[in-house]
């Protein structure tokens, strides 16, 4: 690398952004994550256990449309020291996560993302970076219309209302 390039790199240094540190934590989290992926049945069982938090890091708009019943929403861009301390004060609490890429056949609420850009990956690494290591991830790709996981949201309400109208209409 030339002296000019080194000077340029030094000139744009930002101590609040640490790519090397991120990559180290991502590699550590990736190894840890392998033993923290759950089947649909495991996720369902664990979600009902006391002290377990189901976290949905999608946008509040997508969350309102459809989410796992009982989940709390913290949109990924809003994850910070302050928001985590408020929502998840116990870093040892069991946290279950899921994302768009866990559900198919409901693109409005769960639009698919590139596999390498899955929100589960970003969320897992972010939580791990903040010291939350008791995090479990829903593993499989599930049909949103056939999953065992209870879902709730405005899409279901609209669907129920539509079905009620069609049953009453001759």
Which residues does each PLM region occupy?
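Rhodanese-like catalytic fold shared by cysteine-dependent sulfurtransferases
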Residues: 1-37, 64-74, 79-170
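A short acidic-Thr-Gly-centered motif at the start of a beta-strand
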Residues: 41-50
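Short Gly/charged-rich anion-binding patches and loops
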Residues: 42, 58, 122
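Short, solvent-exposed loop/turn elements at domain surfaces
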Residues: 45, 62-65
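Short hydrophobic beta-strand that contains or immediately precedes a catalytic carboxylate
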Residues: 53-58, 71-74
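Short glycine-rich, polar/acidic loop-and-turn segments at beta strand-coil junctions
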Residues: 58-59, 101
């Amino acid at each position: 690398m030339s002296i000019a390039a080194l000077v340029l790199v030094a000139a744009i240094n930002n101590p609040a952004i640490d790519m090397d540190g991120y990559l180290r934590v991502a590699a550590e989290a990736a190894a840890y994550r392998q033993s923290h992926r759950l089947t649909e049945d495991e996720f369902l069982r664990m979600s009902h256990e006391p002290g377990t938090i189901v976290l949905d890091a999608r946008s509040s708009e997508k969350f309102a449309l459809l989410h796992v019943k009982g989940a709390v929403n913290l949109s990924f861009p809003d994850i910070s020291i302050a928001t985590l301390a408020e929502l998840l004060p116990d870093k040892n609490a069991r946290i279950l996560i899921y994302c768009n890429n866990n559900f198919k056949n409901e693109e409005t609420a769960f639009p698919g993302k590139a596999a390498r850009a899955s929100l589960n990956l970003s969320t897992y690494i972010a939580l791990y970076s903040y010291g939350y290591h008791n995090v479990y991830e829903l593993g499989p790709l599930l049909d949103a219309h056939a999953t065992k996981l209870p879902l709730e949201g405005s899409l279901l309400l609209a669907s129920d209302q539509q079905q009620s109208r069609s049953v009453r209409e001759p």
